């Protein structure tokens, strides 16, 4: 099945136990330069637990965007700290994978959506996340049609 080819996996399990949590802010780390967030839909909660870090340390970040329904809220939250966001989609299948699996069970249109986030505007070939309603489809349309990010998009 699908999980036989999954090179990492997410499994949600109902539990009656408890989980201790700490916010990043609670650790009082002196300097944080870079943060990677891959939390399967809990990205906004993580960001809200690092308000002081975002305000005073302003680290660069890579955020795996799990749920398209949260893009707008995450965009708004990061913009409130003056962050710039850039699309960094990554194909799910890599023929040089650890298991040496040659079959791409995911298909050519399947991948992971990441945002690169920086206080500074980056000189990059990555496409910017242009507004709270931007999507990978809009970004791909801009690339295919060789138009700037301030041009109306097609669907």
Which residues does each PLM region occupy?
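Binuclear metal-ion centers of metallo-dependent hydrolases, dominated by the metallo-beta-lactamase
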Residues: 74-155
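Active-site beta-loop-alpha junctions enriched in small/polar residues
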Residues: 66-68, 91
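Proline-aspartate-enriched helix->loop->beta-strand connector
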Residues: 58-63
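Short internal loop-to-helix segment that lines adenine-nucleotide cofactor pockets
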Residues: 2-57, 68-73
